[in-house]
Amino acid sequence: MGPVVPVEAFRSAGKISALGAKKGYVTFLAGNGDYVKGVVGLAKGLRKVKSAYPLVVAILPDVPEEHRELLRSQGCIVKEIEPIYPPANQIQFAMAYYVINYSKLRIWNFEEYSKMVYLDADIQVYENIDHLLDTPDGYFYAVMDCFCEKTWSHSRQFSIGYCQQCPNKVTWPAQMGSPPPLYFNAGMFVFEPSKTTYQTLLHTLRITPPTPFAEQDFLNMFFEPIYKPIPLVYNLVLAMLWRHPENVELEKVQVVHYCAAGSKPWRYTGQEANMDREDIKMLVKKWWDVYNDESLDFKAEDSIAGEETFSMPSFIASLPEPAVSYIPAPSAA
């Protein structure tokens, strides 16, 4: 169990942000590798769905200047951040590169924005999701993860075949105590930048032993008191297609997370497990169709204008009371 997070770290719940507040999307980029293609694809995807908000790219100092210029040429707001490292520990992360992901915590310091949607660089947006920026304040919104892949082999959930995506299939054994709290995938989430939250995150990190899923485990621990699940249409982790197909209506999915081994479109060969599936091939092609569409390249006239004039969808008017644990998705139609 992690440290107790003081309630002062969170804003008061239950209010709606002012319509004129500055909002945006944010992603994270490190190094000189090919993930920059993912960010370019994401920028073009947000333009394709006519998002009213900018894409901020939080970059580490090791991102080369040519990649920064490429991102600016695609209309991105590039903000350099300093890396954050967890306390020294002998833990083996599920993936070695996860250690650098703690640097994502810097985005809570982007106080010029009242609310943001974080998206990993291997995500693509296929429907307009701007309405997520009008959800009630005081909560952390994200999609529940799946525990069925081998990267979870270290966990109690995996050891007994339990997954929160189908909690009645294998029930949590009484002898193991209470079931674990709901756990989200940190590739996409809705959050509120705040100096107080930012400082508390950094302080809590210094006294929290690292765990295999790095910043994702940490964020789950930290935001457990205010976490609200949202439908998987906002972050389709590809393993859901073969682990829980009964939970997926692919035609309604609005955000696809290309996080399965071999699924990054810019590296795709179809050789890895499950990558020869027709639905995977279709989703990879769908990403490339956006990436290669020159009409989606940034033009000066595309500059984000007048966020104050963005109209709130009727979706917000029908939101349940903030005390509920689930925010429904609007139709993808």
From Swiss-Prot:
Protein name: Galactinol synthase 1
Binding-site list for Mn(2+): D120, D122, H257
Gene Ontology, cellular component aspect: cytoplasm
Superkingdom per UniProt: Eukaryota
Catalytic site: K104
Keyword Transport attributed: no
The keyword Manganese is annotated on this UniProt entry: yes
Xref: InterPro entries: Glyco_trans_8, GNT1/Glycosyltrans_8, Nucleotide-diphossugar_trans
GO molecular function list: inositol 3-alpha-galactosyltransferase activity; metal ion binding
Assigned EC number: 2.4.1.123
Family assignment from sequence similarity: Belongs to the glycosyltransferase 8 family. Galactosyltransferase subfamily.
Needed co-factor(s): a divalent metal cation
Chief location category: cytoplasm
The reaction(s) this protein catalyses: myo-inositol + UDP-alpha-D-galactose = alpha-D-galactosyl-(1->3)-1D-myo-inositol + UDP + H(+)
